[in-house]
UniProtKB/Swiss-Prot annotation:
Biological classification of the source: Eukaryota, Metazoa, Chordata, Craniata, Vertebrata
Domain note: The PHD-type zinc finger mediates the binding to H3K4me3. The N-terminal coiled-coil domain mediates homodimerization.
Function: Component of HBO1 complexes, which specifically mediate acetylation of histone H3 at 'Lys-14' (H3K14ac), and have reduced activity toward histone H4. Through chromatin acetylation it may function in DNA replication. May inhibit tumor progression by modulating the transcriptional output of signaling pathways which regulate cell proliferation. Can suppress brain tumor angiogenesis through transcriptional repression of RELA/NFKB3 target genes when complexed with RELA. May also specifically suppress loss of contact inhibition elicited by activated oncogenes such as MYC.
Protein name from the UniProt record: Inhibitor of growth protein 4
Record's subcellular location: Nucleus
Amino acid sequence: MAAGMYLEHYLDSIENLPFELQRNFQLMRDLDQRTEDLKAEIDKLATEYMSSARSLSSEEKLALLKQIQEAYGKCKEFGDDKVQLAMQTYEMVDKHIRRLDTDLARFEADLKEKQIESSDYDSSSSKGKKKGRTQKEKKAARARSKGKNSDEEAPKTAQKKLKLVRTSPEYGMPSVTFGSVHPSDVLDMPVDPNEPTYCLCHQVSYGEMIGCDNPDCSIEWFHFACVGLTTKPRGKWFCPRCSQERKKK
């Protein structure tokens, strides 16, 4: 496949990437704004509670505290959603980077294959020229036996032609030997060593993930499938390890 074809295919694959990135960034900005609005509401409720705590009944105090707690819960949900969006955005860009790496590897493999074919052709051409030179030398030898004029002219002609044959490979494509290229070497691209790993499976982020509500959790983020989830649970969620630790306490 020509270089232009690889470039065209890659550009087609990233055609929608700017729009997808713009959408995710806009969603994150919206989440930021909603979080700021909730924080302002929390400050207002907290001020109201502090200023009128003595005059409020127990039921009214509990109602205000519940509103504050629910607002904080919403803020955390928005924060989790923003982190999820950030992970999806990273994965989206990383997928295209891997695609580019794969296309570059395939293009390099094609170049090597063409160089090997050119080297084989150059080698076969050199053998043909050597064979032709031997025949011409025989003709020159026969010409020398026919007379002095032929004896002087033929060797010069033969030498001239021999000289051209010997120097011509220098202007041809050089012989280059490469190792065999397998499709698996191209398709099995290594994982980015700088990409962080998560979950009990110690894999990179992909798909839907959920964060553990234990602030001291050493893993923090988990794939839905690895912890047996299909939808995001309501309220606080603790990973299996943190749940066991909480039960021990």
